Amino acid sequence: MPESRGSESSGSTSRRASGTQHIATPKLKDSCTACATSKVKCSKDKPTCARCTRRGLTCDYGLSKRTGRTSHATAQKQQQQRQQQQQSQQEAADRRVSQSAVPVANMLPDVDEFISPMSLQESSILSPTLMPDLSTSGSQAGLDQWNSDLWSTMFAPNEPSSNNTPANTMQTHGGNGNDIDHLFNDLTSYSMLGEPTDTAMSNQHTHTFSDTSSSISPFDQLTSVSDMGSQDFSNIDLSMTNCTPAIQQSVEPANCCLTVALGFMTQLCATASSSCTMPGSHNGNTTLPTIDSVITENRQIVDQIVKILECPCSHDEYLLTIVHLVVFKVMAWYAAAAREKPSLAEEINWTDQQSGRPRSRTHSEEVLRFPPSIDGYSSDGSDNGRMAAQLVLSELHRVQRLVNLLSQRLEGVRLRNHVASSGSSSSLESIGEDSVVGVSLSATAGSPLSSPTFDQLEADLRKRLRAVSFETIDVLRRS
């Protein structure tokens, strides 16, 4: 009997506990909504707290939102809902594809009522009714009509961007152009040497341009390197030269600025000592130019390079690169003319006794040490080195003016590259039209060389000019 009573009591207790668990009331918040909103302490009196009673407010205790991990059943339910949502979206997309395929399916012969997207794609690719006839004479018109939006998108102009860089950020990195003027004034007497009579560098040349066009093959305008080397480019008059490209206008090869610059480079390298082993390299030609011929030739080349830089085609970066090389070669010949005569041991060791070929010298430019003449006066041989150095030093002012003019052209290249990189027309207005005249911004979009490359070329050019000046002055000091 006691055991049966104990079991009945335990069973009733468990039933009451389970019933209580099923009908448990939700937990309310400790603070009412009015006190929680005002952020004051609530007396927690139910059904109305003391503050709400005093103020006559509606006291409402909200349900407490229990935090914690989501139960496993709830997680599965959420995952099923996401899968159902994705499936419904996929079905809606398939319905849209099938609805859009109905007009095309009606155009195709013998097509079932229910067409799949894959079969529709294959039919649209292989069907001759949907593709333009590219074999006919009107293929281009059919292609434009078939996909006009594609061409309009591909060739749409770029929208200009805002200019956020001032023009004064572009600076020349070549140094001061007048850094060697004092060297000429201190160590050289210009009254003895005489002022050069050639005034071609100070003349202003007028260029006439015409917009004539003719279909001439660019291959007809080319000149071989061997023919170019045999021509004398120093006497070419570029004052009235039209430097329109050969594909647009019939221009003589010798009158194009780029061809003339290449001719100068070939002409300056033709008399240089070289140990080239290629066939036809003219190693047997040992004739060296005299100092007078070097001075005369360099003077003519410098004058012609100035005319090239005054031409509108000097905005071409390829031409400016060739002009840099020509100026480097001109200064190399000036240095060779001012250099002291090599010793007898150097002259004997210049030829390799075993092969009989001339070996590479320290300097590729060599001149014949014939006494130079200044205004018809030549020395007896004792002052040859000093006269040559004075003559070279008097000619370096031409090179300095040429470097300054070339620096202006390089500044224009840097400004154009800056404007093209920013892509803003307002940048052009702030910089000025004079700096970028003659070249459209679209032509500078694909610049072959970067601005730092030209900066380094200009810096090396001025450095080389200083070196030649100091070498020449050093010869004058020792003689």
Curated annotation (Swiss-Prot):
Q: Which residues bind DNA?
A: 32-59
Gene Ontology terms describing biological process: aflatoxin biosynthetic process
Q: What is its main location?
A: nucleus
Segments of skewed composition (Low complexity): 1-20, 76-90
Q: Alphabetically list the UniProt keywords.
A: DNA-binding, Metal-binding, Nucleus, Transcription, Transcription regulation, Zinc
Description of the deletion phenotype:
Leads to drastically reduced, but still detectable production of dothistromin.
Q: Where is this region: Disordered?
A: 1-25, 63-100, 349-382
Q: Which InterPro entries match?
A: AflR, OAF3, Zn2-C6_fun-type_DNA-bd_sf, Zn2Cys6_DnaBD
For this UniProt entry, the molecular function terms from Gene Ontology, in alphabetical order, are: DNA binding; DNA-binding transcription factor activity, RNA polymerase II-specific; zinc ion binding
Q: Where in the cell is it found?
A: Nucleus
Where does it sit, as one GO cellular component term?
A: nucleus
> Which PANTHER family does its entry note?
MONODICTYPHENONE CLUSTER TRANSCRIPTION FACTOR-RELATED (PTHR31069:SF31), OLEATE-ACTIVATED TRANSCRIPTION FACTOR 1-RELATED (PTHR31069)
Task: Describe the task this protein carries out.
Answer: Transcription factor involved in regulation of the dothistromin biosynthesis fragmented gene cluster.
Write down what this protein is called: Dothistromin biosynthesis regulatory protein aflR
**Which species does the entry assign this protein to?**
Dothistroma septosporum (strain NZE10 / CBS 128990)
Q: Tell me the classification of the organism that encodes this protein.
A: Eukaryota, Fungi, Dikarya, Ascomycota, Pezizomycotina
